[in-house]
């Protein structure tokens, strides 16, 4: 593997990054210094820097789908919306101060009508970004799809403000006893990724989950999890509210589980410590690969699609395409739609690394 390209500009540990899909090579990185640095990989130096954190680290970034001249930035308990059309400057358009605790992740829906901001209290604020007002709060669980330190993945009906389906990765079954990483480290949900709409058309709706026990799970979000026989799973009486479907997620990576989910763990060449981030590839055959980064200072490239297309149940490292060894823990990563310099990695240093995959 060639030495990565190094992007400099931050004064503290980098926290997250995003890559433009409409302008290949343009990326934005954020850090604990409260700044967002913009780079064009066709150029040598960074384009410009936005100081947006007011002394607070920047926790998350996202473009407005369909209009990458608009970017959303979270810092502290605030989300700011900027116009970056000028390329070398930015203009503050809106500020949203609905979260009571520190925001750790933001995301827009594909229609650019809502923005979700998940904070440390467990609340998810759904913001109507067309009318610039608060729409709804998702609470006491975890939009749409959320994960948390309760080891649960929740699919929401956010129009009603309540969970629709819950996957509990903390519920172990007998198939997991050989996985010591799972036993020693809780299966906290550290990060989620969903493929873009044109990738979803090829498969069922899926979600990649970065777990604290070192496993990367690929879940069919429209299938019911393994049923847990309890009173809550009984058929509701007439006139009563229906309870969300709750179940455990088996972590048998050799065959997935009866729901057709895939679990990529250490036995398949995966991570030996918590997985901190996960994303779907945007280069080449879009969505073909899942790329994960972890506290083991490793980046893994997985060909997950063969499992869902052919139903392969091979053992060994058939799903693992490549592995990168880094010098620091991985905080975040993203990909660009180019054939080279297509993997951007933010680690615990202040320097962003850019690799070529494929």
Positions of PLM-derived features:
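WD40-repeat beta-propellers
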Residues: 36-40, 79-85, 124-128, 153-157, ...
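Blade-level signature of beta-propeller repeat domains, shared across WD40, Kelch, NHL, RCC1
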Residues: 332-358
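Loop/turn segments within WD40 beta-propeller blades
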Residues: 18-24, 61-68, 106-113, 118, ...
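WD40/WD-repeat beta-propeller blade N-cap
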Residues: 7-14, 51-58, 64-65, 96-103, ...
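A short helix->beta-strand "capping" segment at the edge of beta-propeller domains
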Residues: 1-11, 43-45, 257-266, 314-321
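Conserved strand-to-loop turn within each blade of WD40 beta-propeller repeats
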Residues: 30-33, 73-77, 111, 118-121, ...
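Loop/turn-rich, solvent-exposed surfaces of beta-rich toroidal or solenoidal domains
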Residues: 198-224, 252, 259-262, 266-309
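Short loop/turn segments immediately following beta-strands, especially the blade-tip
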Residues: 83-88, 158-164, 220-256, 303-312, ...
């Amino acid at each position: 593997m060639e030495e990565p390209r190094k992007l400099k500009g931050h004064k503290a540990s980098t926290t997250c990054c995003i890559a433009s899909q409409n302008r290949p090579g343009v990326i934005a990185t954020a850090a604990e210094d409260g700044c967002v640095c913009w780079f064009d990989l066709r150029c040598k130096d960074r384009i410009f820097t936005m100081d947006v954190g007011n002394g607070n680290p920047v926790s998350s970034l996202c473009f407005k789908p369909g209009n990458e001249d608009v970017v959303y930035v979270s810092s502290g308990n605030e989300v700011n919306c900027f116009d970056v059309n000028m390329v070398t400057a930015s203009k503050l358009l809106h500020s949203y101060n609905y979260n009571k605790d520190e925001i750790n992740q933001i995301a827009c829906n594909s229609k650019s009508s809502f923005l979700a901001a998940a904070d440390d209290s467990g609340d998810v604020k759904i913001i109507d970004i067309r009318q610039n007002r608060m729409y709804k709060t998702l609470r006491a669980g975890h939009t749409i799809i959320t994960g948390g330190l309760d080891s649960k993945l929740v699919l929401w009906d956010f129009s009603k403000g309540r969970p629709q389906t819950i996957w509990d990765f903390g519920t172990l079954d007998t198939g997991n006893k050989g996985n010591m990483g799972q036993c020693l480290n809780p299966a906290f949900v550290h990060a989620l990724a969903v493929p873009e709409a044109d990738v979803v058309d090829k498969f069922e709706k899926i979600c990649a989950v970065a777990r604290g026990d070192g496993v990367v799970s690929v879940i069919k979000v429209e299938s019911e999890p393994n049923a847990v026989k309890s009173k809550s799973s009984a058929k509701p009486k007439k006139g009563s509210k229906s309870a969300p479907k709750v179940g455990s997620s088996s972590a048998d990576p050799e065959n997935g589980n009866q729901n057709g989910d895939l679990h990529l763990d250490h036995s398949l060449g995966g991570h030996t410590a918590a997985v901190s981030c996960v994303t779907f590839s945007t280069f080449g055959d879009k969505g073909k690969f899942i790329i994960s980064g972890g506290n083991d200072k490793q980046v893994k490239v997985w060909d997950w699609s063969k499992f869902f297309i052919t139903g392969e149940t091979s053992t060994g490292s058939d799903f693992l395409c490549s592995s990168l060894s880094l010098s620091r823990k991985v905080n975040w990563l993203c990909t660009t739609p180019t054939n080279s310099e297509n993997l951007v990695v933010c680690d615990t240093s202040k320097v962003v690394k850019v690799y070529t995959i494929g």
